[in-house]
């Protein structure tokens, strides 16, 4: 997180989207983490959410060809602007799976609205990552 930037809860709207994010980031580590992970299912309600699609990228200064790279500065600035405008959520395309991710802007999220844990699942992230091409090591 950039200094003075907005705190967010980064989620995926589908299980495989969350697994893809987890696998992408953990797959960059050496050695690969061997500990089993826990995937949590949440029920989240927001009041004022904006949807940003790939069609909006050019106007927002996001290079669609480099979207999957780890270059978060522009996305964080857009998140900061959404927070300033009073949004409590942003729906964005996943860079790693065909789904949307919900970014909850913590400071703007009404504490009376639910962010409820509805499920927890132990996952073998390495097996999932291998099966979906995120890691290739045996």
Give residue spans per PLM region.
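Active-site and NAD+-binding cores of ADP-ribose-processing enzymes
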Residues: 2, 25-138
């Amino acid at each position: 997180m950039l200094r003075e930037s907005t705190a967010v809860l980064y989620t995926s709207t589908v299980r495989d989207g969350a697994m893809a994010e987890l696998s992408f980031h953990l797959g960059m580590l050496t050695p690969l983490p061997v500990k089993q992970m826990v995937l949590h299912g949440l029920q989240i309600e927001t009041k004022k959410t904006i949807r940003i699609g790939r069609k909006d990228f050019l106007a927002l200064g996001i290079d669609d060809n480099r979207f999957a790279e780890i270059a978060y500065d522009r996305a964080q600035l857009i998140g900061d602007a959404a927070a300033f405008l009073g949004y409590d959520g942003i729906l964005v395309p996943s860079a790693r799976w065909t789904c949307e991710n919900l970014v909850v802007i913590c400071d703007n999220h009404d504490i009376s609205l639910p962010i409820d844990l509805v499920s927890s699942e132990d996952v073998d992230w390495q097996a999932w990552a291998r099966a979906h091409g995120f890691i290739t090591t045996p």
